[in-house]
Amino acid sequence: MRWNDRTRGLVLFALALLIYGFGIGRAFVFDDVVYISDNSLLHRPDAFRAFWFTSEAFNYYPLFWSLLRIQWLLWGNHPLGYHLVNLLVHCTNALLVWRIARLWRLPAAWWVAALFAVHPVNVQTLSWAAEQKNTWSFLFMALALFAFDKHTARRDWRSYAVAFVCFIAALACKTSTVCLPVFLAMRYAFTQRANARAILLKLMPFFAAAFAAGVTTMWFEQNRVGAKSLMSTLSLWQRIEASGAAFWFYLEKALLPVHLTPMYQGWVDSTASSHGLLPGLLLAIALVACALLSRHIG
């Protein structure tokens, strides 16, 4: 068999399909019931209007909810369709990771994508139909990243427009994608220092969209999801401390994926206080070290 790009892509797609396809016939679990089966808003004839123009949903992820609504119209309360869509989007994401890794000329780009495709931390997302917001948001974020890189390489303004639209779509699926403009700013500050200021100006609309999405999500989290009581127990300083600790916690899960669970103990007052400054300081040192290393290599 000739080992060309098409073959590599098919093998990568099939690998993700094989690893996560065995349990595709499973029932709804955890929030699937709340998000799909028992979600009266999802079943309403005016669901699309409600998702985009009201605050009735659990959170303001209008594109995610709209995609879920389309699936409800297609296969109703049957879990198979939702799990299949989630799996196919994940397989597509693996191909995008490969494409981006090649664009960045990373060594062993295909193996990087293969690791992403089969990594155990994806089990939660692929087992939980309601977690389509992860796979869809990653898809649009990866497309935005790819298009922005294309724009910076070719000065193609259509690619810039595509990148911005895809970023808005990613935010409309899950707000955790607000990190993209920060990542892009850091990436080009290290790799294209001469053009860093111009690129930062181009990223201003991305930062504005991320800020708006973040403020909206904070309101929904406090008034719809019920996070207000938890947030009220943490001071601003404790939240900063917890953020530094959370980075290392999830990095540990990525490097050593053991004792994984769909839900971890929240960052409550007592645990936030126990983190101290060390995790945040180590994170800052790591970022500075990466910047210096990039400058030295560049």
Residue ranges of model-derived segments:
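Polytopic membrane enzymes that build or remodel cell-surface glycoconjugates and lipids
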Residues: 1-298
